[in-house]
Design a protein with these regions (language model features):
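Asp-based, Mg2+/Mn2+-dependent phosphohydrolase catalytic module
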Residues: 1-3, 7, 38, 80-83, ...
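N-terminal helical cap/lid subdomain that shapes the substrate entry/recognition surface
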Residues: 2-105, 127
Length: 224
């Protein structure tokens, strides 16, 4: 088999390079919200913090987690209680599921020639979320920062993955949407990198990914 491929989760396996916060804001606006991006972002970051502290978070699947985060976020926004929470969650989750269904054959194809892994800054329930999307069985290694106790771009978290695969950094690829956590972090330890981002998104200063794609469906050609 050829070298392992590591993937980020949010924004990578469930969307074409668009982070959760940005997609949450779009869903909020579609459900009737009117707060400016800066006000929403402050509330979203606080809801992230509260979600991570919630008892029982490790057992939540994707739908339950998203619904809970929206419950936490609504009172933090100026008009949050007036927003249709069900429509907000349904739109967000529906788009994720469509992307996951599209990406599943790509991942299954890669498993024929490479071991795959996920390395994500998450909340302790990465496995249930991957399972709900039907993606868990594609991965040999699943590293959740809340479980491991390390967060990207910490080199030690990447090293946990390399050790699990019994491969060197130079033999591995990292695919992700975050310039700092995924691409710069992996490159710093010697891993090849593939940045997943919309075509219109400018390359951040100083970022030098080995490859760039706009959809995970483009990845097999990059790796060949």
């Amino acid at each position: 088999m050829t070298g392992p491929v590591l993937f980020d989760f949010g924004g990578t396996l469930d969307a074409d390079g668009v982070p959760w916060g940005e997609r949450m804001y779009r869903g909020y606006r579609a459900a009737g919200g009117r707060a400016a991006p800066a006000a929403f972002d402050a509330g979203f970051r606080e809801s992230d913090r509260l979600l991570a502290l919630m008892p029982g978070i490790a057992g939540l699947g994707l739908s339950a987690m998203v619904e809970r985060q929206i419950e936490l976020l609504r009172p933090l926004l100026p008009d949050g209680r007036a927003v249709d929470a069900r429509a907000w969650a349904a739109g967000f989750l529906g788009a994720m599921r469509v992307t996951a269904v599209r990406n599943l054959p790509v991942l299954r194809g890669l498993t024929r020639t490479r071991p795959l892994g996920v390395i994500s800054n998450f909340t302790g329930n990465l496995r249930p979320c991957l399972e709900e999307l039907g993606l868990l069985d594609c991965f040999d290694v699943v590293l959740d920062s809340a479980v491991v106790g390390l967060r990207k771009p910490d080199a030690r978290l990447f090293q946990v993955a390399f050790t699990a695969f019994a491969r060197s950094a130079e033999e591995c690829w990292m695919v992700g949407d975050s310039p700092a956590a995924d691409i710069a972090g992996a490159a710093a330890v010697g891993c090849s990198t593939c940045w997943l981002a919309p075509a219109e998104r400018p390359l951040p200063a100083g970022l030098t990914p080995d490859r760039r794609i706009g959809s995970l469906t483009e990845l097999p050609a990059v790796l060949d």
